[in-house]
């Protein structure tokens, strides 16, 4: 089904991201990439995934062309940050971290990868 296709999943070390990667791998996906904030979190059964260590909280400061020098066919924006606190107690720094990881990083990755998807006239994005 996904033979000769490439996938990038943000948050691939979490339970949902890991399941997504496993599904694509078991269905013939050629190359699977994922982002993580800490390569130590990578599980031993994830050796088929090529991980990129990336701080999604500061993605606007990164050179995405250099970091992601490849195209993908499928982009799954799965990474998310939750600061367990009620809204009234949330600090501005916590709010900014949540927005940066959950929204701004997705915007920057979408902008980077969809240009290439449009050019080759194929691509799928899951948010």
For each feature predicted by the language model, list its residue ranges.
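N-terminal Rossmann NAD(P)H-binding glycine-rich loop of SDR-like oxidoreductase domains
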Residues: 13, 17, 21
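Conserved glycine-rich Rossmann-like NAD(P)H-binding loop of the short-chain dehydrogenase/reductase
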Residues: 29-42
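Rossmann-fold cofactor-recognition segment
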Residues: 46-59
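Active-site loop of short-chain dehydrogenase/reductase
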Residues: 71-72, 117-127
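Conserved NAD(P)H cofactor-binding loop of Rossmann-fold oxidoreductase domains
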Residues: 78-84
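Substrate-binding pocket helix/loop in short-chain dehydrogenase/reductase
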Residues: 86-87, 94-99
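A short, exposed helix-loop element centered on a Lys and neighboring polar residues
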Residues: 110-111
């Amino acid at each position: 089904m996904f033979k000769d296709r490439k996938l990038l999943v943000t948050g691939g070390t979490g339970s949902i991201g890991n399941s997504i990667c496993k599904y694509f791998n078991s269905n013939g996906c050629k190359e699977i990439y994922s982002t993580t904030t800490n390569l130590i979190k990578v599980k031993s059964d994830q050796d088929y995934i090529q991980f990129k260590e990336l701080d999604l909280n500061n993605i606007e400061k990164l050179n995405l062309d250099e970091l992601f020098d490849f195209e993908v066919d499928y982009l799954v924006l799965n990474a998310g940050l939750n600061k367990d606190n009620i809204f009234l107690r949330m600090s501005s720094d916590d709010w900014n971290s949540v927005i940066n990881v959950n929204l701004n990083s997705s915007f920057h990755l979408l902008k980077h990868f969809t240009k290439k998807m449009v050019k080759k006239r194929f691509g799928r994005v899951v948010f």
